[in-house]
UniProtKB/Swiss-Prot annotation:
Converts heme B (protoheme IX) to heme O by substitution of the vinyl group on carbon 2 of heme B porphyrin ring with a hydroxyethyl farnesyl side group. It is a multi-pass membrane protein. It is an enzyme of class 2 (transferase). It comes from Idiomarina loihiensis (strain ATCC BAA-735 / DSM 15497 / L2-TR). It is found in: Cell inner membrane. Its EC number is 2.5.1.141. The gene is cyoE. This is Protoheme IX farnesyltransferase. The chain crosses the membrane at residues 28-48, 50-70, 95-117, 121-138, 149-169, 176-196, 222-242, 243-263, 274-294.
């Protein structure tokens, strides 16, 4: 099956719009845009103007989608060897590399121009740096070079709250950086839980994820330690007076559940514990930012 998928990379049919949509990783981009919206809202006591909100989300969304499409393009041969990614458009031959390149470049340029012209140059360049960080630095180099790939490369994926903040303020301020640090610290336990679940896939594709290079048990220890660190970082918005009791109670519950998953994965795992932790981590981040928003306006 994998050899057929590999051969299909050069055999394309008429692309369906769903193939292009899949290139953009819409669920990932939706989560990124949620964090960007929260960044915007926390930057002001007033409601965010639609004149800022619409072009900012359009530009950030398009450039995030472009980065995702480049990731599909660069990783197409790796994806053909992994069960989780085998059905993506490029391994299946639904799209050609040339079409994906054109698509990514087009939406990336439109996104940058939108931010530069209708939001502000600072946000445009920061979003561009984030796109390059993920699509080039992480995907092309770090992912293939070091088991710390997602630790270093995670900074690019953590940028959207800052991008939302600068869309409103045109400044980089400490609260926005703290929001970035929450996602940056969240990223390793999120991805390493998936890597533990899919360790054989990554080994087959020769991707040096931590479970492949250092073993499952070492990775579980790192996941637990990073989850403890995440718990501390998540408390910082309350400790510095950025949020109130609604956030403290909500994030404490989320952190307790996340820590419970990390503990179980380390000391009494079942077959599905790693994947369940990965799945919950997405809810953790999404709900954390929703709680930030509720706390800000209530």
């Amino acid at each position: 099956m994998q050899s057929v998928a590999t051969n299909n990379i050069t055999k394309t049919r008429n692309a369906h719009w769903r193939d292009y949509l899949e290139l953009t990783k819409p669920r990932v981009v939706a989560l990124l845009l949620l964090t960007a919206v929260v960044g915007m809202c926390l930057a002001t006591e007033e409601l965010v103007s639609l004149k800022v909100l619409v072009p900012a989300l359009t530009g950030i969304g398009l450039m995030s989608a472009a980065a995702a499409a480049i990731n599909h393009l660069v990783d197409r041969h790796i994806d053909a060897k992994m069960a989780r990614t085998l059905r993506r458009p490029l391994p299946q031959g639904n799209l050609s590399p040339a079409k994906v390149t054109t698509f990514a470049a087009s939406i990336g340029v439109i996104g940058f121009v939108t931010l530069y012209a209708w939001v502000n140059p600072l946000t445009a360049w920061l979003t561009f740096a984030s796109m390059v960080g993920y699509a080039v630095v992480y995907t092309m180099f770090l992912k293939r070079a070091t088991p710390q790939n997602i630790v270093i490369g995670g900074l690019a994926g953590a940028a959207p709250p800052l991008l939302g903040w600068t869309s409103v303020t045109n400044e980089i301020n400490a609260p926005a950086v703290l929001l970035v640090m929450i996602i940056f610290t969240w990223t390793p336990p999120h991805f390493w839980a998936l890597a533990v679940h899919r360790a054989k896939d990554y080994a087959r594709a020769k991707v040096p994820m931590l479970p492949v290079t250092h073993g499952i048990e070492f990775t579980k220890t790192c996941i637990f330690l990073y989850t403890v660190l995440l718990t501390v970082v998540c408390l910082m918005p309350f400790l510095i007076g950025m949020t109130g009791m609604i956030y403290l109670v909500g994030v404490s519950v989320l952190n307790a559940i996340f820590l419970a998953y990390a503990w179980k994965l380390k000391y009494s795992p079942s077959k599905k514990t790693a994947f369940n932790m990965f799945a919950f981590s997405i809810w953790h981040l999404m709900l954390l930012f929703v709680i930030l928003l509720v706390d800000h306006y209530v």
